[in-house]
Amino acid sequence: MIADKVAVIAGTPYDSGLGAELLRAHEVTARPYAMADSPDEQDSLQDQAPGQLAVSFHRLLDQLRQQRVELTMLFCNSLSSVVNHDDTVLPVISPQTVYREVLPQLRSSLVLGGNAHALLGVERTARLISPGHRMLGVSDPMLVRGIENGDPATAFAASQLASTLRRAEQLGLEAVILACTHFTAIGPAIAACCQLPVIDVGSLLVERTVAAIRKGPPGR
């Protein structure tokens, strides 16, 4: 194995587990940590108790540091927009890491999020580093719940997202950004019905985390 442990923090057991599974496929040992038990609880915390959520997040980071965890992957787009993680006791690789890399390379995009907080995270980053970027956002919480129920293919078909993707092509947008780590599970289906480049933030998060682990901390 390449590393002792990476902590994968996400909104629900599904996406924290998915992130850990993807890291293990790269021979990186990882342990999932969910901030909520379900998408409904996650959305409620983000909407009604963001301060409480932030306290819980930073308390978890403190505990992980005491366990000598060296790196955290924040595998949830909406959570990353709600909790401030610019100054933390552990290094955090998050969706913002990916946004800062890809947005300056694009003039426009269709952003697909699991809730409005995920869209806000992309919009906020674009405003700061690429203010000329044209972003159209679609939030589909029901698709997230369908994926969590165990049948991503059926959930994707029921969402009628394919028609939205075709509309993005007609509008001349440059790319589709999957700003929900749940959507990594349906990335191939999205790519199959869309001619635009698909930027899967979840997969890129895994790539950045694996690269950071292989590089190791300074002085290793």
Model-identified regions with their sequence ranges:
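Non-catalytic structural scaffold of enzyme domains
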Residues: 1-220
